[in-house]
Amino acid sequence: PSDSSKIWRKFSYGALMDVFMIDMYTKKDIDLITPSAYHILGQEQDFWLKNELSNSPARWKIVGNQKMIAGWSVVGLPAWFPGDGTYLTTSSWDGWDEARDALLLYLKNNNIHNVVFMSGDSHVTLVADLSDDPYDVGNYSGSSGAGSIACEFLPTSMTRGNFDEMG
């Protein structure tokens, strides 16, 4: 973007890849579960990202993502956890599940392939297939990856401990 107050941007590496750096902090609305009127990226950045992904001729489309986009649902959490015990945290895309679902559905409906989210700030190492409904075995297969819309990589923590190192 031409406005220097907007930190989201794209870096192109020829036909190999486009890297899209997004900003999840300056435009997001308050943390709510399923907030119909809210968006984690803000409308302008959401439009920009979808437009850039649609028009990218690169083989790989890498999205630099500050927080985990895969759902992190944990069975048996106390009801005082976000979403009445459904989510471990709402500071990730879990707090804006409608925005996440809309982005994944956009990728799927527009046949945008080879999208990789590189995420951070979760203090775990994780690789995930991203599906519009990972619990629907007719739509997604965890063993083969069939039905995956994109994938996500979270590297280990760089300067702080992971969950297994806290105590």
What kind of region is each of these model predictions?
Residues P1-G167:
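Metal-dependent phosphoester/phosphodiester hydrolase catalytic core
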